Amino acid sequence: MSTAYEEYMRQLVLPMRQELVQAGFKELTTAEEVETFMEDAEGTTFVVVNSVCGCAAGLARPAAVQAVSGSEKGPDETVTVFAGQDREATAKMREYFEGYEPSSPSMALLKGKEVVHFIPREQIEGREMTEIMKNITDAFEKHC
């Protein structure tokens, strides 16, 4: 790909990245960052696999942000990787989602390095945002 195209795409997705980062999510952009984070993972971590698709913009990101900020119980850490943009980081994070098909957008709640709750695209696309938020907050209540 051309450098101009890559720069265009970086600028295009910047607001999509910032929506989660500004809400306190730590963005992991390289496989090394994912490895370093996961090596020390203790407690609970809520992971959002971000995406450029419409259901990420209209449902996944807003539901994740509102669930984290509005829940009485919540994870110890919130992180995000960006599918289709930070491919190596996303692939490395998905290695921890053993038994789950790659899906973007998607969300996972981990205890240590083990997935205890997973929300694939199929449980995001076509749903009401309140349903997605409830799915997330129910997982927080059960596991955090």
UniProtKB/Swiss-Prot annotation:
Disulfide bonds: none
Entries under InterPro entries matching the protein: BrxB/BrxA
GO BP terms, alphabetized: cell redox homeostasis
PANTHER family hit by this protein: BACILLIREDOXIN BRXA, UPF0403 PROTEIN YQIW-RELATED
Family indicated by similarity: Belongs to the bacilliredoxin family.
NCBIfam families membership: YphP_YqiW (TIGR04191)
Name the UniProt record assigns to this protein: Bacilliredoxin BLi02323/BL05224
